[in-house]
């Protein structure tokens, strides 16, 4: 099952910061893609990546998650 997770991120105010978050998310098992922009990220994963793992990766990069939610679930092809 493919899951799209939307995340609002506090303090991520530059392209450099977005790259740091992108790099941190790349280390989370199950993440297929991550579109990280200033203040937010849209993550597609196979369902193995938990909210706790996603939040942990973002916090490890030095930022705080203010909102996280799953937007849609699609079968993996």
Placement of each model-derived feature along the sequence:
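Flexible metal-binding regulatory segments at protein termini and peripheral loops
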Residues: 1-77
């Amino acid at each position: 099952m493919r899951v799209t997770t939307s995340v609002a991120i506090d303090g991520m105010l530059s392209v450099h910061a977005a790259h740091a978050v992108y790099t941190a998310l790349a280390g989370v098992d199950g993440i297929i893609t991550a579109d990280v922009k200033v203040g937010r990220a849209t993550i597609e994963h196979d369902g193995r990546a938990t909210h706790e793992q996603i939040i942990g990766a973002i916090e490890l990069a030095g930022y705080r998650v203010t909102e996280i939610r799953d937007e849609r679930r699609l079968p993996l092809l």
